[in-house]
């Protein structure tokens, strides 16, 4: 290898490392306020919400993966397989839209660099839940550390080293405090897409989706037990922040396989149906409708309930 070629390769490696570290911060770097351990009992004895985020999960790959748990939720719930996730096809803008109920022109997040994050008046799901009732028990678990920076005011907020650990911590929370809203973020599918390709023809990518489905199955077994024995009624939301093409997804606003995603909402008392004209800003209004919370007009949400 010539000196010139070596320098080019070295530069590419350094730039790649800088990109990765800007997106995936280690938990040791998280501010102390992002790690919270208060596992307190939920106040709602019946209505509760399980919000599941599967990072970087293409719709056609989800359908090709044939996960029994995810298939069951699709067959029982409200579904849309052509949901507009909006512009800026990377994770932080996508999750900010889902968790804040507004598009990037309001929440201001347009990249994964959130070192100067400032949502201003456009707060997150947990803040608005607290406004309605300060006593709500709220929990968030993710194995991508930046995810915990997108919300505030949880009682329990924990990072994990793997999707399996997200599942284990979710079971701990369900069995020890049963929050009113439990937010889970699984990151392995996105990681596998970057490693080997976002494609329904990629067996490694499909396996990552199936693996998450297995974890969801275990969690849903606990949810069903609680519903049958304690009379709880759980709304279950399953969404993603973006799809992908090749081994990437950034800057792909015009690619359908990246921009258009899925929504699955299992709502107690509602039969299966396919939704039309859904977008990711509709998730928060739908959750709040189920929890019988009337949004204030000052929140300026961009979406409407899907039922």
Predicted regions and their residues:
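Sec-dependent bacterial lipoprotein signal peptides
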Residues: 1-22
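Bacterial Sec-dependent N-terminal signal peptides
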Residues: 19-46
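Metal-dependent active-site segment of extracytoplasmic phospho-/sulfohydrolases and closely related
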Residues: 50-51, 69, 211-252, 287
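Short, structured active-site-proximal loop/turn typified by the sulfatase FGly-forming signature C/S-X-P-X-R
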Residues: 60-94, 101-102
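A short beta-strand-to-alpha-helix junction
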Residues: 87, 112-122, 203-210, 270-291, ...
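Substrate-binding rim/cap in mid-to-C-terminal beta-strand-loop elements of soluble/periplasmic
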Residues: 93-101, 253-294
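Catalytic-site neighborhoods of secreted/periplasmic enzymes
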Residues: 106-166
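Active-site His/acidic residue clusters
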Residues: 148-158, 171-214, 218
